[in-house]
């Protein structure tokens, strides 16, 4: 049986309230945005899609081997932004200040995943997705609010583990379940 899987760093629980307040500010635009539930907030390192049991075991081994070269590290979450651009907003995110270690970790993992047949990530930017735009209503107001939040400081957290997660899509939204948690 295949599962929809991805590799991620969970947002520190102590920062969820602050992110929820930022989401509340963005909700005031009354735009067509599906906001990420606080318990689902994470930094994606790699989305695998549907993978079978054998490939999951290989992914786990690659992650375990790669993480041996890393110690826990701190990141600061700061600034709101969008993908792909402010004129056509699809994703609203919060960024990572000084993301070098985070980006290096992602690159190291991705190089190994490419050897397994996964597509390489292009132009990876460490970010915390806070919402996905579903329609055009009040997009200008949303863009204005995001602009006002471009320097917002969320806080710092220690990255000490990476989670291999299952994503189950439901009408109420995705349900994420940890399949394996790896310590740095």
UniProtKB/Swiss-Prot annotation:
Keywords of this entry: Hydrolase
* Gene3D superfamilies, A to Z: Cyclic phosphodiesterase (3.90.1140.10)
What GO terms are given for molecular function? 2',3'-cyclic-nucleotide 3'-phosphodiesterase activity; RNA 2',3'-cyclic 3'-phosphodiesterase activity
Principal EC category: hydrolase
- Which parts of the sequence form the motif HXTX 1? 42-45
Family matches, as SUPFAM superfamilies: LigT-like
What the entry lists under InterPro entries is as follows: Cyclic_Pdiesterase (IPR009097), RNA_CPDase (IPR004175)
Q: Where is the active site?
A: 42 (proton donor), 127 (proton acceptor)
Motif HXTX 2, residue numbers: 127-130
What are the TM regions of this chain, as residue ranges? Answer: none
EC number, as in UniProt: 3.1.4.58
Reaction catalyzed: a 3'-end 2',3'-cyclophospho-ribonucleotide-RNA + H2O = a 3'-end 2'-phospho-ribonucleotide-RNA + H(+)
Q: Give one Pfam family.
A: 2_5_RNA_ligase2
Identify its protein family: Belongs to the 2H phosphoesterase superfamily. ThpR family.
Which PANTHER family does the annotation name? RNA 2',3'-CYCLIC PHOSPHODIESTERASE (PTHR35561:SF1)
Q: Main role?
A: Hydrolyzes RNA 2',3'-cyclic phosphodiester to an RNA 2'-phosphomonoester.
Annotated NCBIfam families: 2_5_ligase
Q: What is this protein called?
A: RNA 2',3'-cyclic phosphodiesterase
